Amino acid sequence: MKLLNKGAEEIKEIEGKLTLLEQKFPGCGEKPSDGDMSVPAENGKPIEKDDLKKFPTFDGKDLDGNEVKSSTLFAKNTVTVVNFWFTTCNPCVEELADLEALNKQLAKKGGAVVGINSFTLDGDKTAISDAKNILAKKGVTYKNIWFDSKSKAGEFTSGLYSYPTTYVVDKNGNIVGEPIVGAITSEKQSEKLQKLIDQAIANSKN
């Protein structure tokens, strides 16, 4: 009987801890869909819809150390597909080949794919090296960039709850529609992404 009582107390203690975790990280523990790896935001704050109208400006660098500014990056493309990923996220790595194929398709229309590996923020040398190794193995040629984690773009990145997450940005730096949460490899996700791309290209003609 004592063993049963002790077991019941331990179960209650575990349930209490789980409740606290769910309150702190409401998205944690939910079953991911379309190949996404859900993680809590570092600052615990959701991204407000008003903040999604413009992609946060940044002065960053690519993984080879070349300077990249958001103002010129978006302006030179009819559409920019921005993919947030990290090195140990399997769904992120698995879709790299699809993103590379997409980049080649967009190039014909004056567009491009840009990757942002959240581990490489602040120019972390080890993270950059790891990311470059994976990108090379997957045959990725499109630009991957990093910026200061304390910048507006860095805070935006920290506010993401799921990876991979993909945004479509027009040439004026406006975010088009809602982000694609999860890998783009499924037909449903691919169709959603294509509609946003078409809209962004249409915006660039106005």
Language model features with spans:
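N-proximal helix/coil linker or "cap" segments that precede and/or mark the start of modular domains
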Residues: 1-59, 74-77, 129-133
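A short beta-strand-turn-helix
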Residues: 58-80, 105
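Loop/turn elements at helix/coil->beta-strand transitions in domains of secreted/extracellular proteins
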Residues: 75-80, 107-114, 138-143, 171-174
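Aromatic-flanked redox-active Cys/Sec active sites in thiol-based oxidoreductases
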Residues: 83-89, 118
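C-type cytochrome heme c attachment motif
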Residues: 87-94, 165
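Structural microenvironment flanking redox-active thiols in thiol-disulfide oxidoreductases
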Residues: 94-137, 149-154
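Short, internal strand/loop/helix patches
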Residues: 129-172, 180
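Thiol-/selenol-based redox modules, centered on thioredoxin-like
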Residues: 168-206
